[in-house]
């Protein structure tokens, strides 16, 4: 391994072509320098599209008090109140504090929560509400969950924290076989574990490797009897978490850990709930529906902005918020309007939320007949989370997807923008044979554009909106 | 049950060396002093390889339904020096990791074992290469002692291809021959260790598995499930709780109903060991291995140790314990200083020679760390991202997070 750079190796043929052009080599050398610095899968240098998310300006967060209070889902009393700037963990802390204050039966426990928790979500709660209501548990996930279920069955409202979603698996049996089935099996007895809320941080964090970056939400969506909730920011986190705590169903609240400090917005100071099982349309559009939840929403927003600007398409963005049971009506209505749908999540693609949404869309006759393209999924690959290559796995702004039948196209970061939908769409559809293999077509096309495909590396410089032909 | 344990441990007392410092009636506990072993200096041979007998402190062990190991240990000068060298290398390696982390060259989660070196080193000096070791996420020292090189361990932390796990695992997930990790899930390695022990028993040979977990992990249900299987099938398993007093930020007493972790096996005999004294660890594990491979079934050991640093790199380690406590352990119970003192006092090596060992260990680590830092960062290719997961040919044909200017293209 003498090679000093991280470049993708060009073929011999490509090299000889390069050698023939001195100016070309010179032009590459400056890029090499930037490559050398990129030891981790951080944001690409010189990227036009895959830029770091600017949480300070994203329209997905309420940056002003006015924006936060204009939310029509909030009751009038809240909208007439005040707001405070909070990040995600502070909003969660606020919700937990509210729940503890308003209801004696609310308990909070988990590993290290009395010290504030590893992500600071429970800061000062033990001091304020006492060690008998906010307390540390041993490192015993299965025990924590069973304990919480027992407490909930007696009418308490336990909020159990699993320190990382990756640690929840020992507790899986308790969630699946006890919490979710409690009401069903008790029947007329009327007991349930409905007061149970489980919180856990999930998702990529940049370098979590095998056991600190997973997104196991789809596993819980397979269990009737649980509600699975993923907030995208502080306002949501507070409202959804309070709703979950007050809800009489066992709820799993998964918090994208990368947003704990990154996502900051104005949050109403008074207590409020946001509806569970209800999606939110973040942006209306007419050509394609993008369905997502949690952190990838920010990337979707960046992608659709680029798509709208570059291709003149109009994209609708839906935040599922509750991923089980999810809001089919909102999604179906949107897809009936646009005819196209992309589902985006970090968790691996197989048997994920995307699969469920896609299947439901095609099962619904009224929505199916309106489809103009297969429902696409952009999700993590079917791999364990890599250590240094996390960004190479997570969906990004330019993730490839095939929205139209058989059409694959390449839109490269920094390449001339000549594949505009309105100019070429119909031509491409005619050119590409439906059954010749999407990838092959895209490769042919890319080769024409001079991308080096010989190493079998296809860059992810393919923007989803290209396919909205 | 516990009264029986107390009775047994009293009954075992006469076996111990004559000098009892603690009244029998008083509740005794294992010392964490690292320099209490003694030797009759006249018995120390000239030769490096000739064994001589040292006498361990009578506070080195506590037992539960088990006769204590002999309070004597045969060692050679060479072994003592090697143990010292190994502990210094492990500590230097951890310090290097600390530095690289603070320089932001190592990212992610990283747990250091500074202060706990005597356990990894003592265990390895008591077992054979054919035995197995499996441990928790605080695994750098074990990976080194099992045969991993410093460069491959630091390379792993840096995410390099030449790292011990191809740069894919990082701090918590290291594997080498006879070493099954490194596991990021608290307690998950314990039943896996029982399976390793079963395979050893099944395939025959006098082999054992050393299974380590922390005081925090000892409350995981699967630890008890593993205990039961190991005893039921009489497996050659040496369960070992590395009790460093804190599971993350929660002290043992706040998380555990019974902090005598060596008694946690209930129906499995237990042995509590001074985990700051590498010689006591060696003596205990040596004894435990012999005991278990003779068909006596599993053993639950407890290594009483201490970590100087925080739980991980993001924990300063001072919010849940006093600085004085850390300072006291460092200054009076340090495993490396303890062994050093004895080596010099016993005349096994002169102060100059010990300094030479220090220097050699430091130079070795520096050289290896430099080599690790010089390793090329992994190529961001699909091959690396998808290898060992997808059947060849079925991989996704592209990776994410790249831009066009990061490839060569022609035309």
UniProtKB/Swiss-Prot annotation, chain A:
SUPFAM superfamilies: Thiamin diphosphate-binding fold (THDP-binding) (SSF52518), TK C-terminal domain-like (SSF52922)
Molecular function GO terms recorded: 3-methyl-2-oxobutanoate dehydrogenase (2-methylpropanoyl-transferring) activity; metal ion binding
GO biological-process terms attached to the record: branched-chain amino acid catabolic process; response to nutrient
Protein's UniProt keywords contain Mitochondrion: yes
Signal peptide: none
UniProt-listed CDD domains: TPP_PYR_E1-PDHc-beta_like
Record's subcellular location: Mitochondrion matrix
Transit peptide: 1-40
UniProt-listed InterPro entries: THDP-binding, Transketo_C/PFOR_II, Transketolase-like_Pyr-bd, Transketolase_C
Cofactor: thiamine diphosphate
Superkingdom assignment: Eukaryota
Residues given in the record as K(+) binding sites: 194, 196-197
Record Pfam families: Transket_pyr (PF02779), Transketolase_C (PF02780)
Binding site for thiamine diphosphate: 167
Major enzyme class: oxidoreductase
Role: The branched-chain alpha-keto dehydrogenase complex catalyzes the overall conversion of alpha-keto acids to acyl-CoA and CO(2). It contains multiple copies of three enzymatic components: branched-chain alpha-keto acid decarboxylase (E1), lipoamide acyltransferase (E2) and lipoamide dehydrogenase (E3).
Subunit details: Heterotetramer of 2 alpha and 2 beta chains.
Protein name: 2-oxoisovalerate dehydrogenase subunit beta, mitochondrial
Lineage: Eukaryota, Fungi, Dikarya, Ascomycota, Pezizomycotina
Curated annotation (Swiss-Prot), chain B:
Residues binding Mg(2+): 215, 244, 246
Annotated pyruvate binding sites: 111, 137-138, 184, 186, 215-217, 244, 246
Major localization listed first in the record, in broad terms: mitochondrion
GO BP annotations listed: pyruvate decarboxylation to acetyl-CoA
Localization, UniProt: Mitochondrion
Subunit composition and interactions: Eukaryotic pyruvate dehydrogenase (PDH) complexes are organized as a core consisting of the oligomeric dihydrolipoamide acetyl-transferase (E2), around which are arranged multiple copies of pyruvate dehydrogenase (E1), dihydrolipoamide dehydrogenase (E3) and protein X (E3BP) bound by non-covalent bonds. The Chaetomium thermophilum PDH complex contains 60 E2 units, 12 E3BP units, about 20 E1 units, and 12 or more E3 units. The units are organized in 1 E2 60-mer, 4 E3BP trimers, about 20 E1 tetramers, and a maximum of 12 E3 dimers.
Domain of life: Eukaryota
InterPro entries: DH_E1, PDH_E1_Alpha_Subunit, Pyrv_DH_E1_asu_subgrp-y, THDP-binding
Origin species: Chaetomium thermophilum (strain DSM 1495 / CBS 144.50 / IMI 039719)
NCBIfam families listed in its UniProt record: PDH_E1_alph_y
EC identifiers of the protein: 1.2.4.1
GO cellular component, one term: mitochondrion
Protein task: The 10-megadalton pyruvate dehydrogenase complex contains multiple copies of three enzymatic components: pyruvate dehydrogenase (E1), dihydrolipoamide acetyltransferase (E2) and lipoamide dehydrogenase (E3) and catalyzes the overall oxidative decarboxylation of pyruvate to form acetyl-CoA and CO(2). Within the complex, pyruvate and thiamine pyrophosphate (TPP or vitamin B1) are bound by pyruvate dehydrogenase E1 subunits alpha and beta and pyruvate is decarboxylated leading to the 2-carbon hydrohyethyl bound to TPP.
Organelle transit peptide: 1-29
Reactions catalysed according to its record: N(6)-[(R)-lipoyl]-L-lysyl-[protein] + pyruvate + H(+) = N(6)-[(R)-S(8)-acetyldihydrolipoyl]-L-lysyl-[protein] + CO2
Keyword Zinc on entry: no
GO molecular function annotation: metal ion binding; pyruvate dehydrogenase (acetyl-transferring) activity
Amino acids binding thiamine diphosphate: 137-138, 184, 186, 215-217, 244, 311
Protein name, UniProt field: Pyruvate dehydrogenase E1 component subunit alpha, mitochondrial
Entry keyword set: Magnesium, Metal-binding, Mitochondrion, Oxidoreductase, Pyruvate, Thiamine pyrophosphate, Transit peptide
Cofactor(s) required, per the database record: thiamine diphosphate; Mg(2+)
